[in-house]
Amino acid sequence: MSTQDLEASMRKSVEATQRNFNTIRTGRANSSLLDRISVEYYGAETPLKSLATLSTPDSQTIQIQPFDISALASIEKAIAMSELGFTPNNDGKIIRINVPPLTEERRKEFCKLASKYAEEGKVALRNLRRDAIDKVKKQEKDGDFSEDQSRDEQDAVQKTLDKFIAELEKHLADKEADILKV
């Protein structure tokens, strides 16, 4: 595995972790909070983004305007059943969600969730490192690399991992600061 391939794979892991971070509530409304909601639509689970336009008219409100009015009740039910704890308000054309301010206890829960997502991201990065080092060792065993070249490659893999873990830690610190900001 080349260094560019390894970096690309690690970049994807960091981006996946960032997408997970985006689903965690902060003190203000954000349409990405609803990214993981699937709606039963004509018998199939469909992502909410595919069924409606999501917007945030102000810092405390998320507005959902379905493309098909017949999906309104299903969307409302999916939001109410989600673990987000939102109560949707349906006016017959648009669903509005008032995002209440977070309690201190809820903020701490979300910080723990962010830490869990970051740890999952680190595990994915470490797995990529392990795979890359295994390939380098195999190449050394096959005679493609000398012992010194193998050690240099392994050091390069470790430095790449360290860089991406530091980036992940920075994203986690930013997200925690965002969650804890009142």
UniProtKB/Swiss-Prot annotation:
GO BP terms, alphabetized: translational termination
Positions of disulphide bridges: none
One Pfam family it belongs to: RRF
CDD domains: RRF
Top-rank taxon, per record: Bacteria
Keywords (A to Z) from UniProt: Cytoplasm, Protein biosynthesis
Entry GO CC: cytoplasm
Positions of transmembrane segments: none
Keyword Protein biosynthesis: yes
Compartment(s) of residence: Cytoplasm
Task performed by this protein: Responsible for the release of ribosomes from messenger RNA at the termination of protein biosynthesis. May increase the efficiency of translation by recycling ribosomes from one round of translation to another.
Family of this protein: Belongs to the RRF family.
Record protein name field: Ribosome-recycling factor
Organism: Parasynechococcus marenigrum (strain WH8102)
Protein's gene: frr
